[in-house]
Amino acid sequence: MGSPTHFGLFLISDAEREVHMEELKSQEASKSKPPSKPKSNFTTFSHGTPDLSKIHKVGMLATVCRTQGYFVLGGGPIIEITGVSNDHDNNNSNLVEITESKNDTSDSTTTTTTTPSTSITPITTPVVPQIPTSKYLKVSIEPHEYSELGDSLTVRALRLQLVKCIYSAINRYQDSSFAQHLKQICMLPIFKMDDSSLLNSIGPLCISSPSEYQKLLECKSLEEKLNMVLSMLVKKCEVFDFNFSIEKQLEEKTMAQQKKYFLTEQMKLIRKELGIDLDEKETIKNKFNSRWKEIAVMDKQILQVFKEEMDKLSSCESNSSEYNTSRNYLDWMTLLPWNVYTNDNFDISKVKEILDRDHYGLKDIKEMIQTFIAVGKLRGSIGGKVILLVGPPGTGKTSVGKSIANALGRQFHRISVGGLSDVSEIKGHRRTYVASMPGKIIQALKTVKTSNPVILIDEIDKISRSSQGDPNSALLEVLDPQQNKNFVDYYLDVPYDLSRVLFICTANDADSIPAPLLDRMEVMTLNGYIQSEQMEIAKRYLLPLVRKETGISEEQLQFTPEAIKKLCELYCREAGVRNLKKFIDKIFRKMAYKLSMGMEQSVIITPDNLEQYVGPIKYPSSRLFQKQKPGIVMGLGGSLIHIESALDRFTNGPTVTTTGSLGLVMRESIDISYSYVKDFLLKVDASNDYFLKNSIHIHAPDGSTQKDISSAGITIVSSLLSLATGKLVKPDLAMVGEVSLTGKVIGVSGIVEKIVLAKRESIKTIIIPKENKKQLEEIPDFIKEGIEIYLVDYYSDVYSIAFTNDSTIKPLIFNDNKENQNENENQSEVKSTIIQ
């Protein structure tokens, strides 16, 4: 066929385009390597003879022109396919050949239809593609003429405006390919003489989608087409302007940064030459040296490490990672208070005054602090010590630590270790890691700027183990007086003296602390508060504190003693007073709302209107069973424990069923008690074979609470005996103690807390093991007042006390003592705490 001079360009339909794009995606996905040859502007189809239904009928007859040694495909007239021609009509000049792909020859690649991308641009190529002779489809075409003439005034004005925009774009965007294409089109002869060719050449450069281009091709109004091309050209120019503005801003910003950098470097060099200023490295070195001289460390090992790090800092480049590591290390080294100590307060009377002002009671803790200061006064300096405060939540353990620091005149720092599982939090991270830093102990010393502070390690019983190590083992070095004089943090890697630090640890349960760690502490117990103590705490501390926080005066809101008693008795039975403060806060908040709304001017809280402010009663009764029944006995643990035994009528044989969220220890205690009670019942009544014939169900109410104690042995035996004999245990009687298979009553731990619990629950008679007699001396007299305490050695003693009236054991009765009572009033023997 030779080299063609015209090409008929038709867009494929939208549906065909989607199918074709899916094929291209699948081909690209199947290729393992990118194509070695660049993609051409023609797309090859292998679908056989084209189907006219898959292409648009209106297209363009492009003209191949030669300019400046290149072949350029320029826009030509718009044509429309009218139908398929017969094979014999070969001489018709209005026929266009649509070729078919033929794969039977090795050098033939047939192009049937051109698929434009988002914009159709003039194609510049040194060689015009040759279309091989093959099977083809002839179609009839005719010009797609405009419906109106192009000589109107509007058309002329639009044509002039379009030409002005073209030349403006060429001048403004000279370096862009868009301007180069416009420039090549302007050089063609058709640019100056044919409006249609001009529009058909400019339009493809400005389109944004194939549908927009097809709409441009099918337009029959010259005026409308001029408007479309002109608007597309203006939009194209706006996009270029926006891109150029962004590029200009980036260029200006980059130039400004470079200029600032060069000027800064020049200024540094000039100041250095004039001796006005030193460089950054010299400034930092001078700062570290001046700090180190003020510290005056005498340890040779520490001095050697400091010198080596300073030499390393001098040899490193300022932008290297080693430089930053050395600088951070030296910063920590020079900020620690190596030889800084605060002066301790040796005035014992003043210390006692501060402790009594902040806390009432706590006799053992106050005596320990006073003796601690007395020893330091004789020595001339107060050394370190490790104290463990054990008690229920809300009893003021943290506030005690703050009061001790205030009394001694030392700095105070609190470290919370609850849930801690990484040893590095205690001993620091090694410097090989990124963003490494010292542990919490060294950080605390840097914060307080002294080497003898009071450090409170809070919730030490809640430390956990993990794959990162055991923090409890790391604390051994911190808290051991023989080791903490040379405590080595992994980050510092030099010894630091912690021997003069007063460590105060807090815990709710000392049993969960490892024995080696517990052995290094002096354990002080803070028991729970009874009702009278809670009332005093509310009057003396909580009410004034909440008044200050809310701004409500005493004239606006008052409390009667009966209301405070009801609040403590029916709403706040916890061992601490934190929950009591929450209820008082709630009352004051509701009162503040009423004052702000003008609903009330002043209110007096009484037992009658208390529920309006705090809601329904939380604890309607302190006892689960108001009426005593056989098989029910009351025991003491962390709270009141009722052991309930009943006959299981629907189970055959002598069996025992247990319920109530019982732990392994308590289940073993039930087994021991059941084995013993069968033998003991035969001794009491040989004819009673109750346990040999019947099945028993033992239950501990409040099943949502886990129970795992060994101190309920005598309680379980008494419950089973009460069921078997039908006898009732004396009212207001609670018992605690572990029983053996021979009936021996074994001592238990936490007897002080259990007596306090009994006092809080208004229990009048208590049975405890004889082995726990010494622990009674630790309980203040005002707590033991009004309670009968029986000391028993064997269960036979328990039986005679609980079920008969012929017991030979006399109770320990703590009656009112005027002398002690006056002393208590003078010394205010009521434990209290500041809620913070």
Swiss-Prot record:
Keywords: ATP-binding, DNA-binding, Hydrolase, Mitochondrion, Nucleotide-binding, Protease, Serine protease. ATP binds at G391, P392, P393, G394, T395, G396, K397, T398. Residues 1-237 form the Lon N-terminal domain. Residues 627-805 form the Lon proteolytic domain. GO terms for biological process: cellular response to oxidative stress; chaperone-mediated protein complex assembly; mitochondrion organization; oxidation-dependent protein catabolic process; protein quality control for misfolded or incompletely synthesized proteins. Residues 106-122 have a biased composition (Low complexity). Its EC number is 3.4.21.53. GO terms for cellular component: mitochondrial matrix. Residues 24-48, 99-122 are annotated as: Disordered. Coiled coil: none annotated. The keyword Nucleotide-binding applies. It catalyses: Hydrolysis of proteins in presence of ATP. It is found in: Mitochondrion matrix. The active site is at S711, K754. The keyword Lipid metabolism does not apply. Belongs to the peptidase S16 family. HAMAP family: lonm_euk. PANTHER family: LON PROTEASE, LON PROTEASE HOMOLOG, MITOCHONDRIAL. Homohexamer or homoheptamer. Organized in a ring with a central cavity. This protein may be expected to contain an N-terminal transit peptide but none has been predicted. ATP-dependent serine protease that mediates the selective degradation of misfolded, unassembled or oxidatively damaged polypeptides as well as certain short-lived regulatory proteins in the mitochondrial matrix. May also have a chaperone function in the assembly of inner membrane protein complexes. Participates in the regulation of mitochondrial gene expression and in the maintenance of the integrity of the mitochondrial genome. Binds to mitochondrial DNA in a site-specific manner. This is Lon protease homolog, mitochondrial 2. It comes from Dictyostelium discoideum.
